[in-house]
């Protein structure tokens, strides 16, 4: 059996009970196809990068699944016709990490190292840190 990361975005106007109902349907579909939900993370309501089905926000849900390729095919068919689901994506992964994903809420990550993790992520992605702000010493003037 293979492992898969599954993420889907739900309409932001859904209540907590409706989100739980969609997650229950998703888990039932996984179990019906012989798969297993290894981990679930609710990332919450977030701003979308662009309009998706006339929505500017969505509720992100992340799962790690174990199952066969046919399971993913069945899930895509069912998520594609679900009116509450805006977008979805499944990716096959080699191994499962015990660490929570970077977008997981802080409660799921644990108390230790939250600030350090956030700072590491910013520097990893080339974001400016305090000593870079306002420095113009490394700019090159274009002699026009």
UniProtKB/Swiss-Prot annotation:
Determine if Ribonucleoprotein is one of this entry's keywords.
yes
Pfam families, from UniProt? Answer: Ribosomal_S6
The record's section on SUPFAM superfamilies has: Ribosomal protein S6
Task: Reply yes or no: does the keyword Membrane apply.
Answer: no
User: Mind listing the UniProt keywords for this protein, alphabetically?
Assistant: Ribonucleoprotein, Ribosomal protein, RNA-binding, rRNA-binding
Task: Report the GO molecular function annotations.
Answer: small ribosomal subunit rRNA binding; structural constituent of ribosome
Residue span of region Disordered: 99-144
GO terms under biological process: translation
- Give a GO cellular-component term: cytoplasm
Q: Which InterPro entries match?
A: Ribosomal_bS6, Ribosomal_bS6_sf, Ribosomal_S6_plastid/chlpt, Transl_elong_EF1B/ribsomal_bS6
Superkingdom, taxonomy of origin = Bacteria
Compositionally biased spans, kind Acidic residues: 128-144
Q: Where is the composition biased (Basic and acidic residues)?
A: 106-117
Q: Relate the protein's function as given in its record.
A: Binds together with bS18 to 16S ribosomal RNA.
Q: Which family does it belong to?
A: Belongs to the bacterial ribosomal protein bS6 family.
HAMAP family annotated for this entry?
Ribosomal_bS6
**What is the protein name for this chain?**
Small ribosomal subunit protein bS6
């Amino acid at each position: 059996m293979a492992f898969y990361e599954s993420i889907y975005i739900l309409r932001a106007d859904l209540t907590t009970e409706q989100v739980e109902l969609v997650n229950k349907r998703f888990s039932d579909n996984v179990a019906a196809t012989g798969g297993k939900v290894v981990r679930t993370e609710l990332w919450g309501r977030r701003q979308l990068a662009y309009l998706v089905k006339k929505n500017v926000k969505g509720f992100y849900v992340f799962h790690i699944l174990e199952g066969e390729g046919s399971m993913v095919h069945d899930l895509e068919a069912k998520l594609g016709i679900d009116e509450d689901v805006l977008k979805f994506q499944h990716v096959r992964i080699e191994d499962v990490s015990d660490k929570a994903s970077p977008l997981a809420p802080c409660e799921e990550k644990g108390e230790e190292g939250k600030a350090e993790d956030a700072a590491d992520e910013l520097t990893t992605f080339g974001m400016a840190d305090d000593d870079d702000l306002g420095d113009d010493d490394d700019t090159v003037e274009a002699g026009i």
